[in-house]
């Protein structure tokens, strides 16, 4: 029996955010594509200026450290995830905690994670 589009949509609809994130990454790896929106062609001068000053940063949890419970609490507070999803994120490190945040927010998140005992970085 073949799988229909409706079967796929139902399965995707039942997934958590973390499961959907893993699914997207699996698609990117298997098919060599990117889920990022395609950028409209911009003038070369504007692109060079944008490359010089980065305005959006990603906070990446690289290791949970010894005090995993505190790290899970901080991840939950930063992301709004449920307990299971936050635990899965911490257990599956390295994982991106937040994407596209300002430099000040990224530094604040990094400080909270490191104070909880985690190892994290800003990309």
Swiss-Prot record:
InterPro entries: Ribosomal_bL12 (IPR000206), Ribosomal_bL12_C (IPR013823), Ribosomal_bL12_C/ClpS-like (IPR014719), Ribosomal_bL12_oligo (IPR008932), Ribosomal_bL12_oligo_N_sf (IPR036235). Coiled coil: none annotated. GO terms for cellular component: cytosolic large ribosomal subunit. Pfam families: Ribosomal_L12, Ribosomal_L12_N. GO terms for biological process: translation. GO terms for molecular function: mRNA binding; structural constituent of ribosome. Forms part of the ribosomal stalk which helps the ribosome interact with GTP-bound translation factors. Is thus essential for accurate translation. Belongs to the bacterial ribosomal protein bL12 family. Homodimer. Part of the ribosomal stalk of the 50S ribosomal subunit. Forms a multimeric L10(L12)X complex, where L10 forms an elongated spine to which 2 to 4 L12 dimers bind in a sequential fashion. Binds GTP-bound translation factors. NCBIfam families: L12. This is Large ribosomal subunit protein bL12. It comes from Laribacter hongkongensis (strain HLHK9). The gene is rplL.
